[in-house]
Amino acid sequence: MKRSRVPSTSEDSDNGSNSTSWSQHSNSKHRKQSGKRPSEVFRTDLITAMKLHDSHQLNPEDYYELADPWRQEWEKGVQVPVSPESIPQCAVRTVAEKSTAPLFIKPKKLIRSSESSMLGYVGIQTLADGMCRYDLNEEDVAWLQITNEEFSKMGMQPLDELTMERVMEEFERRCYDNMSHAMETEEGLGIEYDEDVVCDVCQSPDGEDGNEMVFCDKCNICVHQACYGILKVPEGSWLCRTCALGIFPKCHLCPKKGGAMKPTRSGTKWVHVSCALWIPEVSIGNPEKMEPITNVSHIPSNRWALICCLCKEKTGACIQCSAKSCRVAFHVTCGLHCGLKMNTILTEADEVKFKSFCPKHSGLDWNEEEGDDDRPVKVPTREDRSRNRGIDFSASSQTRLSQNPEETRLSERKLRVQQLEDEFYRFVAADEVAEHLQLPLEMVDILFQYWKLKRKVNFNQPLIMPKKEEEDSLARREQEVLLRRLRLFTHLRQDLERVRNLTYMVSRRERIKRTLCRVQEQIFHHHVRLLEQGRVTGVSSTRRLEEAMFYFRTTPPVPASPQPLKGHCGQNSTLSSSEKGSNSYRSSKHIEADKPAKMLMDGVPSSGDSVRSETVMSASSRRSEGRTRSGESHRKEEESERPLEDRRRKSKLWDQVSIKDKLRHAKSMEDTLSSETELDTMDDRLLLSHTNANSVATAPNMYSGSPRKTNASHQGKLVPNGTSGRHLKNWGSFRIPKRSERTSAGRQTERQEADNTADQNSSLKTFSTSPSSPQIRTRLRTGSENRRHLEESDLGQSEQGKRCHTQRLPSPMTRRYGSDVIQRGVLAS
């Protein structure tokens, strides 16, 4: 079915024109009226003819099935030329083939430059080739003068120095070239054509097409192309790798030097190709080039430890005999030179197996069994076996027997070389030199005779170094420089590795030290925080913590309610039963007076208040009886001990003050004591008036927030055993008392500290405007509870006095430094 087509717009035009494209079958009135030809024409009948209904019957080869979905833009049709007659026609004509003959080129000899050639514009190689390499010495100049005189007498042309140098250089060049060629051919030594010459790697004397035997022109080793990795035989001379580099290294796997060697991957070690093939752990990186030698480090240590049975040296890596139950070891090169039985077998799976045998098993008639080698092997006779029975197979004797033919060949070769060197003049023809240099034959012949005499005087050695050897020497020097630089960089790299390892270890050590210091700092701050918390919250917890740190004990559990410390005589002094009774009577009166204030602050009475109420009732009855009996005597005692009662009443009020108020009061007390230094003298007088014979130190010491006077006996007074305490200054101000001194010294010190504490509190009361903070917070006990407290305090004070009273440090030092000072002091003692 033919579909009607919607006219396209200007956006569909390829040339960007504003004209509208119409179909060929469309009848547009606009196009007829205008008379203009359309810019584009599309045929839609082709698309319509291509479409077939699915029910249409056609052969499969007559149509193509469209797998892609139909697109709407395909309905536009196929674009056709607007005017096919306007298409240009191509014109073709036959052109004759261009001639390949070269054009005229002007000869260089006809080209002349107006400017003279300068030295800088000439190549260095050209200048080097133009320079004569032979220089006349004084002897040559003297001979030249005598010869020119003879030439003048004979009527010949005199000879100049430059011509003589050129002739001598030509003699040396021709002699070297001809002698080298003679040594390489059968005419000279016949080395290449010797039937006994074998490959240094595979020990085979045969060569094949594409696998020729190549000889080194310097060390004269013979190798196959495939055995040494020679891809292409060079024209002229050929040098092996070691000779090309001008080095004579030692094999890394055997003690031998020389031979067909290849470098390892690093380039610093050299290995025989035969050693690399026979040692199973070693491999070759590129089999075509037969280098580099790899996996040398994979050789086990037990192979390096084997000792060669031929050379008796523990050097390199050895191989072992392939016979069963035979573990005789020998080097690969030693076995090859001694003629041991060493075969390469090609298996059916195209694998090469290497079989090597020791001298004992190499003497067997193995040709009949294997049949792979055509070389005759000497089978020892019965006489030889009987002669050699019981004698060790020494390396020297075997090497002497096996190397006799080779030594003979070497000696013959040396003789031939010596003979060639003696007859060096046979390799130079004077007439050829005269023809080449275009000089008179008589003059060249006279110079030839002089050259022969001078060279014989020089022990047949060349007068100038051959150009090739000179280039090789220069290349060798450059190679040596490169090797030295390589070694230098290798050592530098190793040194840098050592420095890096050292810096890593130092940085790791410093990090560990920093971590340790941080841990110690955290421990120190934790101790300080515990001490500060104990000082703020209460003296008892702080003192118990300090005792645990000072005396190396575990931290005792802190009780819920404050309790008196045992062992500190300055704070818990012993009291007699009569004094305790009077104190309980007077304290009960103050407790009764202070009880309403405490209930107002706390809000709810505690369990201790009930005990205090009972104490007040008993104390009131005792007070009534005491008033009827004594009267005025009790009144006088009350007036004399009123400061003590006021001090106790203020201590009860101090327990009810908050922590912030205590801190504020402690700070104000420190400021007051530090600012009012002029009151120290009055303080000393008041303290001396309350003591009988003991001197009291005037400097106040803060211990956990409370002031304390230091006894003068600790600063230079004699201790109970009569020794001075001044020598204990550098030992932490403590010493371990003797067993006989503990009881008496403890009691005496307790009494002195009790008196000092009382005097201190009275002096602080006199000079302070607010009540001072007590050292401990306790409650007064009455009746049986008070008596039980006295018994416990007596026992605790006696034990502490015996154990650790004299070991206590001053309080400011313990608060600042913690247990570290005590530990050092104990270690030092």
Swiss-Prot record:
SMART domains: PHD. Keywords: Activator, Apoptosis, Cell projection, Chromosome, Cytoplasm, Cytoskeleton, Metal-binding, Nucleus, Repeat, Transcription, Transcription regulation, Zinc, Zinc-finger. Its main location: nucleus. The keyword Repeat applies. One of its GO terms (molecular function) is zinc ion binding. Residues 374-390, 622-648, 738-754, 782-792 have a biased composition (Basic and acidic residues). CDD domains: ePHD_JADE, PHD_JADE1. Residues 1-10, 394-405, 570-586, 607-619, 697-714 have a biased composition (Polar residues). One of its GO terms (cellular component) is cell projection. Residues 1-40, 368-408, 556-651, 697-829 are annotated as: Disordered. Scaffold subunit of some HBO1 complexes, which have a histone H4 acetyltransferase activity. Plays a key role in HBO1 complex by directing KAT7/HBO1 specificity towards histone H4 acetylation (H4K5ac, H4K8ac and H4K12ac), regulating DNA replication initiation, regulating DNA replication initiation. Belongs to the JADE family. Component of the HBO1 complex composed. This is Protein Jade-1. It comes from Danio rerio.
